[in-house]
């Protein structure tokens, strides 16, 4: 009885170990912008989703595998600094619940199958998936994260790939201003978002010797740089107007509110509360923007003229 109970407990833990290794939370959050890019392409080119059911399924499966592979590789490489930081010290690669060799092979297999599934949509989607994975693992995880205050900027390009992949899975041309705008918005969005996290986790990053901007340059420099990026975010929102004035206005409003919150909060709150308010609004911003893109696109597909 005792041995059976131990086995059952171990089996219950396996899904959790796998989920933490491939970072299922990040996978879920990235599937939303991927689907936004996908539905926007369907809307732009007046394609019924029912005509593209295989491509839609393959895009989801391929994206899940590629993003999961990135998580596995990141956990594998970062296990030394993850062991120092409170929020990452219980990751399976740190605790030994999964061996480095297993994490490596998991990442390799997920990469191969992820690229295959994306290639079943279009070759461009697979190429973009590979570029995103490579940029996240090599320039970001293996180099810039530990060496420069611009690590967030370098990592942001890979983090902005999902909408491009979604669009490319439907139509193999990502030069339309609307999808370029969505891509750049996702790049810029990451700086205020991750700066806010770094302020709140300042001591952990400092202990792990990770040169995040707030750790190295302080809160005032971070405040200035955050506002610069938010102004850029406002300007880039105009690109969405090439496809929809409504989407452009939603993006403009959200970005202006974010900038106003940053300026007001910095003057009225301590740095911890200011960072928390920016972090919460960053989640609100991205959720509302991409949900609006998806709803607008689907309504246009099914009810548009």
Curated annotation (Swiss-Prot):
The keyword Transferase applies. One of its GO terms (cellular component) is plasma membrane. Coiled coil: none annotated. The chain crosses the membrane at residues 22-42, 53-73, 94-114, 115-135, 154-174, 179-199, 230-250, 283-303. It comes from the Bacteria. Belongs to the UbiA prenyltransferase family. Protoheme IX farnesyltransferase subfamily. Interacts with CtaA. This is Protoheme IX farnesyltransferase 1. It comes from Bacillus cytotoxicus (strain DSM 22905 / CIP 110041 / 391-98 / NVH 391-98). The gene is ctaB1.
């Amino acid at each position: 009885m005792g041995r059976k109970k131990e086995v059952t407990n171990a089996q219950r833990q396996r899904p959790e170990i796998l989920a933490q290794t491939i970072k299922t939370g990040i996978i879920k959050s990235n599937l939303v912008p991927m689907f936004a890019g996908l539905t926007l392409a369907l809307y732009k080119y007046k394609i019924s989703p029912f005509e593209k059911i295989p491509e839609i399924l393959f895009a989801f499966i391929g994206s899940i595998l590629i993003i999961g592979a990135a998580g596995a590789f990141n956990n594998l490489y970062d296990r030394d600094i993850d062991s120092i930081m409170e929020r990452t010290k219980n990751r399976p690669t740190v605790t030994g619940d999964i061996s480095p060799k297993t994490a490596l092979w998991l990442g390799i297999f997920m990469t191969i199958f992820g690229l295959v599934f994306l290639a079943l949509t279009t070759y461009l989607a697979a190429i973009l998936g590979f570029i995103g994975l490579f940029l996240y693992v090599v320039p970001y995880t293996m180099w810039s994260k530990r060496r420069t205050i611009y690590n967030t900027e370098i990592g942001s390009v890979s983090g902005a790939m999902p909408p491009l992949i979604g669009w490319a899975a439907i139509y193999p041309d990502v030069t339309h201003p609307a999808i370029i705008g969505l891509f750049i918005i996702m790049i810029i969005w990451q700086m205020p978002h991750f700066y806010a996290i770094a302020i709140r986790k300042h001591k952990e990053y400092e202990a792990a010797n990770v040169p995040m901007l707030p750790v190295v340059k302080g809160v005032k420099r971070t405040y200035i740089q955050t506002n610069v990026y938010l102004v850029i975010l406002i300007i880039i929102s105009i690109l969405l107007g090439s496809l929809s004035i409504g989407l452009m206005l939603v993006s403009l409003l959200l970005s202006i509110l974010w900038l106003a919150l940053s300026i007001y909060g910095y003057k009225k709150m301590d740095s911890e509360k200011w960072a928390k308010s920016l972090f919460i609004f960053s989640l609100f911003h991205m959720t509302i923007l991409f949900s609006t893109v998806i709803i607008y696109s689907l309504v246009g597909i099914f009810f548009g003229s």
